[in-house]
Amino acid sequence: MGILQKFSLENRTAIITGSGRGLGFEIAKAFTEAGAHVWLTGRSAETLEAAVNTLREAGGKADYAAFDITDTAAGGRLVNRIMDEHGHLDILVNNVGARDRRPLAEFSDEDVLDLIRTDLTSSISLSRDAVEAMNKNGYGRIITITSILGYIVKPGDAIYPVAKQGLTGLMRSLAVDYGARGITSNAISPGMFATETNAALAENPDMVAFAKLRVPLERWGQPDEIAGAALFLASDAATFVNGHVLTVDGGMSVRL
């Protein structure tokens, strides 16, 4: 097999959470262009339908399932549906996440649990269901989107880094427990990306200046710049990559 063929996702089926827009959508776009049948998830059926239509118009194979990621039973039903309709689930991208920027003293116990449910335990539950399905075919790729803020912490952002470090631990546990079964587990740790959610920040002159100061590439990342990293980890070009965190931050995390 030639090297370019190893990046093909033909006949692969993937779930990408939080993929109606932003980084998740760009990953979905790359996967469909590489030949995968991608299931997009999120809360808004309207947003997901528009995203799926965009992918289909470009010749991609895509469907969607609208549900709250904290509804773990709904995630399990999606895995079962994919197994019934396709016979195999090959790739899971744990991308969905929320943000609540506050110092710890301002969090109630329930506030903490709400963020942890969305950013951590939902991925644990869906990964559990996914590896059970993948194990039936002896093949799988699990990619978990973490953040450089899992190990470089900003003031007043107490719980988000906790969840992101937890996701790294999940990724490594899956890598150790399931690698011998043909299922690899890796993570992507993004830096500053100019997604729709961050659009106002990315255009703020102070944040533009901050990026020039802190990021060696002197700019924010564009959403499509994460797609190549995800495609690599999902493909047969990464068959011996397992338990790895691939940082995609323009060098921000290595600059003093």
Task: Indicate where each model-derived feature is located.
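Short C-terminal tail/terminal secondary-structure segment
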Residues: 2-5, 152, 231, 242-256
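Conserved glycine-rich cofactor-binding loop
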Residues: 13, 20-22
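Substrate-binding pocket helix/loop in short-chain dehydrogenase/reductase
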Residues: 103-104, 111-116, 211
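Active-site loop immediately N-terminal to the catalytic Tyr-X3-Lys motif
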Residues: 105, 152-158, 180-181, 218, ...
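Active-site helix of classical SDR
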Residues: 127, 163, 171
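Residue(s) in the substrate-gating loop at a strand-loop-helix junction
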Residues: 147
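Short, small/polar-rich loop/turn modules that mediate ligand/substrate recognition or access, typified
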Residues: 179, 184, 241-243
